[in-house]
Amino acid sequence: MKFSIAAAVVAFAASVAALPPAHDSQFAGNGVGNKGNSNVKFPVPENVTVKQASDKCGDQAQLSCCNKATYAGDTTTVDEGLLSGALSGLIGAGSGAEGLGLFDQCSKLDVAVLIGIQDLVNQKCKQNIACCQNSPSSADGNLIGVGLPCVALGSIL
């Protein structure tokens, strides 16, 4: 009996985790019609250049453009009973609704070498713009190459 309940819970968790992503435009990396992601929590002002943004990140972090952001915050869910809330993290409920931004699928934004070129950072990146800590690790999906800790640029401007 206990084994069948555990097997049912594991099967349900696997089916929820294997669901395809929603086709909603707010979750698209570059938005509908290449107009940017409407789900950017900390937007960067329109007049900020790539050089200004890179200077704000400092020499210990690199300016990055991130396709995916997960926000975890101040909400606390108290679940009671056997297996209550065991799958809430998989379905998007409970703790992790809003707040601290964890960024994924980031690529480095290069500062223009030529003096006089003032590219606006919002033209280079339509997604989440972040300052990611310099590290020799890689964020390629394996467990050893841990993703870099990043902070939204809009939250520190």
From Swiss-Prot:
Pfam families: Hydrophobin. Its main location: secreted. Keywords: Cell wall biogenesis/degradation, Conidiation, Disulfide bond, Glycoprotein, Secreted, Signal, Sporulation. The keyword Coiled coil does not apply. It comes from the Eukaryota. It is found in: Secreted; Spore wall. GO terms for biological process: asexual spore wall assembly. Disruption phenotype: Impairs the production of thin, proteinaceous, outer spore-wall layer, called the rodlet layer. Reduces biofilm formation and the retention of the hydrolytic enzymes within the vicinity of the fungus. Residues 1-41 form the signal peptide. Induction: Expression is induced by the transcription factor brlA. Self-assembles to form functional amyloid fibrils called rodlets. Self-assembly into fibrillar rodlets occurs spontaneously at hydrophobic:hydrophilic interfaces and the rodlets further associate laterally to form amphipathic monolayers. This is Class I hydrophobin rodA. It comes from Emericella nidulans (strain FGSC A4 / ATCC 38163 / CBS 112.46 / NRRL 194 / M139). The lineage of its organism: Eukaryota, Fungi, Dikarya, Ascomycota, Pezizomycotina.
